[in-house]
Regions:
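Structural motif in protein kinase domains
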Residues: 67-77
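Regulatory extensions flanking the kinase catalytic core
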Residues: 266-307
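Glycine-rich ATP phosphate-binding loop
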Residues: 1-19
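Short beta-strand micro-motifs within the conserved protein kinase catalytic domain, predominantly
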Residues: 45-60
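Catalytic-loop of the protein kinase fold
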Residues: 101-127
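The N-lobe alphaC helix and its flanking beta3-alphaC-beta4 segment of protein kinase-like domains
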Residues: 17-48
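Conserved C-lobe activation region of Hanks-type protein kinase-like domains
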Residues: 169-239
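Activation segment/activation loop of eukaryotic-type protein kinase catalytic domains
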Residues: 122-163
Length: 307
């Protein structure tokens, strides 16, 4: 797969080029993007999908908005974040996942929920104001209730091993419950939130160099067998150092992350619940940090009611 960047109608655009053998991925991503209900400020803006000829070879183009800051992983490798930067990045990421998972658009129109199935920091792009947009929907799945268990089973076991939830690594996903696919996304989202938190200067002291989740435990591209040992059997998660908890906002965020990567899928927060927490933190920042425990337990109660 290749990428091009060029000026189209006086605007820089990005072109994702799929070779013939990746037609299925192009087709799936095109179908996801052409759903008008997908449009959202935290979802990569789609422009067009085209079939092109390069000599005797066919190739398939996906044309989208261009974001010069690149992906989240590279951005975090280059930059240290303020608390405000973290709030914008994490909040916009959560907002995008919430929109994907929702049964309704922000305007109240019904929509089919979508599971991304490959949330990771390289599949998140950075806009100019330190806000995130989700991209790469090549293996995304429409959670259409009219589909059968067999249809979902045929969608295959996909994703990136480092970011796979325990139940995916164990091949024990409950295909009869569409919420299972959302729960897997929430686990992966929690790892990305941890990556963002790890580069925030609100923790005090020296901010460590960027490393991916489980970076000190596994090699650069770990296989599923290795991740099973770490995540499934060892029940390990990325470290949350104690100095992160000295900042009340970070403490609140870390509690949320921990609840999102719970080993039990049913115990994880929904993306909607996480979005509500971020909205509350944004709207009542100073009040929240002075009363974090009261708000925490109140909000957990609300989330449990939602489930």
């Amino acid at each position: 797969m290749n990428f091009l960047y060029f000026i189209h109608q006086r605007t820089m655009v990005a072109v994702k080029i799929f070779p013939c053998e990746e037609f299925a991925s192009w087709k799936n991503e095109s179908q996801i993007f052409t759903d008008a209900n997908l449009k959202h400020c935290s979802i990569l803006r789609f422009l067009s999908a085209e079939e092109r000829h390069s000599g005797l070879q066919k190739e398939y183009w996906l044309i989208t908005a261009y974001h010069s800051q690149g992906n989240l992983k590279d951005y975090l490798s280059r930059n240290i974040l303020s608390w405000r930067d973290l709030q914008k990045m994490a909040g916009s990421l959560v907002s995008g996942v919430t929109h994907l998972h929702s049964d309704y658009t922000a305007g109240g129109s019904p929509k089919i929920p979508i599971a991304h199935r490959d949330i990771k920091s390289t599949n998140v792009l950075i806009k100019n104001h330190q806000e995130c947009v989700l991209c790469d929907f090549g293996i995304a799945l429409r959670l259409d209730p009219s589909l059968s268990v067999g249809d979902f089973a045929n969608s295959g076991q996909v994703g990136t091993a480092r970011y796979m939830a325990p139940e995916v690594l164990e091949s024990r996903v409950n295909l009869e419950d569409l919420e299972s696919f959302k729960q897997m996304d929430v686990y992966s989202m929690a790892l990305v939130l941890w990556e963002i938190a790890s580069r925030c200067d609100a923790i005090g002291g020296k901010v460590k160099n960027y490393e991916p989740p489980f970076g000190s435990k596994v090699r650069e591209q770990p296989c599923m067998e290795v991740m099973r040992d770490v995540v499934l059997y060892g029940r390990e998660r990325p470290e949350i150092p104690t100095n992160w908890l000295a900042h009340q906002g970070m403490h609140f965020l870390c509690d949320t992350i921990t609840e999102c990567w719970d080993h039990d899928p049913e115990a994880r927060l929904t993306a909607h619940c996480v979005a509500e927490r971020f909205n509350l933190m944004e709207q009542t920042d100073s009040w929240l940090f002075n009363h974090v425990w009261v708000v925490k337990y109140t909000n957990i109660s609300l989330c449990m009611e939602e489930k």
